[in-house]
Amino acid sequence: MVSDWKNFCLEKASRFRPTIDRPFFNIYLWDYFNRAVGWATAGRFQPKDFEFTVGKQPLSEPRPVLLFIAMYYVVIFGGRSLVKSCKPLKLRFISQVHNLMLTSVSFLWLILMVEQMLPIVYRHGLYFAVCNVESWTQPMETLYYLNYMTKFVEFADTVLMVLKHRKLTFLHTYHHGATALLCYNQLVGYTAVTWVPVTLNLAVHVLMYWYYFLSASGIRVWWKAWVTRLQIVQFMLDLIVVYYVLYQKIVAAYFKNACTPQCEDCLGSMTAIAAGAAILTSYLFLFISFYIEVYKRGSASGKKKINKNN
């Protein structure tokens, strides 16, 4: 009897054993996501039928994208001047909802992308996954667009900071605007390497927005510095891969005779890849500078104050 029950349980459990094609409990999440979104939008948006076309979807043309980003800067810097005379708002509940929503959405985009890219990387290798046209699939294009739209929702981070009278740093404001532009640039440039910085960024954002949610809930978190460290590591990994793809692109275009054993024209426009590399490089330097300023010099000055008091 016990043996039969054990075999029954093992048989049921085996149905949820992860595979390369279905890494999350042997469930193809993309199908469930497609059905859920189709139901929620009453069939108006079906992820499986989506195709990114410049001028067809919201914020798919350069002019409205640049206008939206410009409006973001006008609102936050103009708003900061307007609210100076007002009392800072706490907005605790709104901050909790905002951050919990973004950590959840980031996690959803992340697992859906991992589900799509894991079989490609496993069967064809990393080089294929960052260069070949077949790694730019319809589900990934849909997820890239949804992730891109999320970047405009993240602008609310800064609006909440302004209403709370929090200090705005150059890193924060530059990063938000540049990331929206970066995601758009990679979408229109059809760069196969896009999934690398996007998935790494989503993984960090899951932790980052969870940290913000806990902070908004009044919970003190000891691992705040680790979020910045992870962001720095993320940009380092991004740049290793992106600069390699840019190198391959340049060699394939101008120095065919100097090709490495693996050398092909990686999918994506040269301009999009170069612009992406430039923006990610600026992020790396800015985040390292921020980390030194806040966690290294800040802790050193704190120790000096303690010594003076003693």
From Swiss-Prot:
Name its GO BP terms in alphabetical order. Answer: fatty acid elongation, monounsaturated fatty acid; fatty acid elongation, polyunsaturated fatty acid; fatty acid elongation, saturated fatty acid; fatty acid elongation, unsaturated fatty acid; sphingolipid biosynthetic process; very long-chain fatty acid biosynthetic process
Membrane topology per the entry is: Multi-pass membrane protein
Provide the protein's localization.
Endoplasmic reticulum membrane
Main subcellular localization, coarse class?
endoplasmic reticulum
The induction comment states: Induced in wild-type cells supplemented with 14:0 fatty acids and repressed when cells are supplied with 16- and 18-carbon fatty acids.
Q: Name one GO cellular component term.
A: endoplasmic reticulum
Any keyword Iron-sulfur? no
Question: Which intervals lie on the Cytoplasmic side per UniProt?
Answer: 85-100, 164-174, 224-234, 293-310
Additional facts recorded? Present with 937 molecules/cell in log phase SD medium.
Q: What is known of its domains?
A: The C-terminal di-lysine motif may confer endoplasmic reticulum localization. The HxxHH motif is essential for ELOp function in vivo and 3-keto acyl-CoA synthase activity in vitro.
What this protein is reported to do is described as: Component of a microsomal membrane bound medium-chain fatty acid elongation system, which extends medium-chain-length fatty acids to long-chain fatty acids. Component of elongase I, which extends 12-16-carbon fatty acyl-CoAs such as lauroyl-CoA to 14-18-carbon fatty acids by incorporation of malonyl-CoA.
Q: Which family does it belong to?
A: Belongs to the ELO family.
- Spell out the protein name for this chain: Fatty acid elongase 1
